[in-house]
UniProtKB/Swiss-Prot annotation:
It comes from Aulactinia veratra (Green snakelock anemone). Disulfide bonds join C42-C54, C46-C59, C52-C66. This is U-actitoxin-Avt1. Residues 32-41 have a biased composition (Basic and acidic residues). Keywords: Cleavage on pair of basic residues, Disulfide bond, Knottin, Signal, Toxin. Residues 23-40 form a propeptide. Coiled coil: none annotated. Residues 24-50 are annotated as: Disordered. The keyword Coiled coil does not apply. It comes from the Eukaryota. The presence of a 'disulfide through disulfide knot' structurally defines this protein as a knottin.
Length: 68
C-alpha cells in the first residue's frame, strides 16, 4: 500500500469512530430536561447568576457551579 492509501484508511476509521461515539452520547438520554452533554456545559463554574448560560439555571454561591 502506498502512503495515500494508508492515510485515507486512517481518516475513514477516525470518522467512523467519532460518529459512533456521538451516537452513543445522544442515545442514552432517558431523563427529561437537557441532554447529558448540555447539562455538562450548563454546570459550569460561576460567580453569579449571570454566569450561567442555560435558562432557568442559577448560581448557588460565588465560586460554585451553576445548578438547575
Amino acid at each position: 500500500m502506498n502512503s495515500k492509501a494508508i492515510i485515507s484508511v486512517f481518516l475513514i476509521m477516525l470518522v467512523v469512530v467519532s460518529c459512533t461515539q456521538a451516537t452513543y452520547e445522544t442515545e442514552d438520554d432517558d431523563e427529561p430536561g437537557p441532554r447529558h452533554s448540555e447539562k455538562r456545559s450548563c454546570a459550569r463554574g460561576c460567580g453569579g447568576d449571570s454566569d450561567c448560560p442555560c435558562p432557568g439555571w442559577h448560581c448557588p454561591s460565588p465560586g460554585g457551579r451553576c445548578e438547575p
